[in-house]
Design a protein with these regions (language model features):
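HIT superfamily nucleotide-processing domains
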Residues: 1-145
Length: 145
């Protein structure tokens, strides 16, 4: 636990929390690339993938399986997913020095890849907070089923 770390401070992301296990938080990003964008954050503070415990890794994997399993059953045309993590300083894209992994559930009807959106954030509409909140509530309900 690091008192200066955003992901160690539960209050800083509690409004984004979709699911919590004994060792993992599932967070909906403040600026999602698209609706099915998730962040898996180990509760254990470690800056890099290779730094956190095997127990946390096992729990994070189980949480990923749970999310993919629940949402794949929703018949929304999911065709797979991407996992992305940045390990290093800000120059490699790791803005918070606490390991976390982004998951993008991919759909057969998507018009633009999340990688294109990540590389050109002008293509995403950050101004629509109502849509983000509606997406968050829908996802939270699906994951609770």
């Amino acid at each position: 636990m690091n008192s200066k770390c955003e992901f160690c401070d539960y209050k800083s992301f509690s409004q984004q929390l979709l699911l919590e296990t004994s060792r993992t938080y599932l967070i909906y990003p403040r600026r999602p690339i698209f609706t099915y964008h998730f962040m898996f954050v180990p509760k254990e503070h470690a800056p890099y993938f290779i730094s956190f415990s095997d127990e946390s890794l096992i729990d994070m994997k189980a949480t990923m399986k749970l999310v993919v399993g629940k949402l794949s059953k929703s018949k929304e045309g999911f065709i797979g997913y991407n996992l992305v993590s940045n390990n290093g300083d800000k120059r490699v894209g790791q803005k918070v020095p606490h390991y976390h992994c982004h998951m993008f559930l991919r759909r057969d009807d998507e018009e633009i890849s999340p990688y294109t959106l990540m590389n050109n954030r002008d293509l995403t509409d950050d101004s629509d907070g109502e849509k983000r909140e509606a997406d968050f509530n829908i996802l939270k309900k699906k994951l609770a089923e």
